[in-house]
Amino acid sequence: YPNEPVLYNISGACFAGLGQLDNALKSYEKALAIKPDYAEAHNNLGITFQELGQLDEAVKCYEKAIAIKPDYAEAHNNLGILLQELDQLDAAVKSYEKAIAIKPDYADSHYNLAVTFQGLGQLDEAVKCYEKAIAIKPDHVEAFNNLGSTLKELGQLDTAVKSYEQILAINPNFAEAHNNLGITFQELGQLDEAV
């Protein structure tokens, strides 16, 4: 059956979605036993290894997926997430930039790149990337929230307030935004609004 590797890959994703990571691993490995150059299965196997905390194995899987399919934006993004987790921030930046070069409208890569720049203290770059993620995905509340905190770090409190207010217009129950908005109002000396 020529579609058998695809079916194993799909069943692996289903098992992963159910939290049955050992079964997911087995399914991806079956797919790869039949079709060793199946980039998507290598990527999914990497995600599963990462969830299991087997980070070295995850790196190998993402790198294998990229070697097979160099224009695989999702694998570059996933490798970036893993490198970020390993505190290899400069390498993570390169992975996200590759993902964005391949897929310029990849909101998650712009967001992840922004988080990494924020971690590196490159706040102006982080702001640009958060804004790009939001331009692509206007309901990206995490990007708005982190944009607000970055603007706050830059001393742009009024603009940070606008960012938090935009989150609450999208999702009025986003508790972290309420908290951040209150703290920012307090820092602005607007105690009535802070309450």
What are these regions (language model features)?
Residues 6-17, 40-51, 74-85, 108-119, ...:
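Conserved alpha-helical positions within TPR/SEL1-like repeat arrays
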Residues 19-25, 34:
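Leucine-rich, hydrophobic repeat-scaffold detector
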Residues 34, 68, 183-195:
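Low-complexity/repetitive intrinsically disordered segments
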